[in-house]
């Protein structure tokens, strides 16, 4: 049961969202690796912005604080006024958001990889934080729309277009 006493809806889009995000991260990784930032998205040539990477929990915390302090974020989502604490997470499987304590947990470096210390992952977790009620599906249409709005306003419209098109190709619904 959720904090407000309601049952959260079934998370039927979770696998589709994660599949789409993995594809998007791959596009950003290749753009960074090879220096070719222009990609074709369903016939449109788009130059991807640079995705920020983080070195530590402290740098993620600073970024989260700055995103939540943006005027347009505070104006759009009441929960932007609720501070988020960032902590390291054991293991390397996933980042996650803990609703009850407003905690964003990110796995740090595992070997040579720090896959979760990146802007797209942090914005995904912030989209969970900004949910107005605990009754919505964790990766449902409302979440996906909120995530894309964050990406659009923080990283840029080109990144948001890539996510929207990729999610659409994976069968993700928006609301």
Model-predicted regions and their roles:
Residues 1-120, 129-175:
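Active-site-proximal or metal-binding-adjacent scaffold patches in catalytic folds
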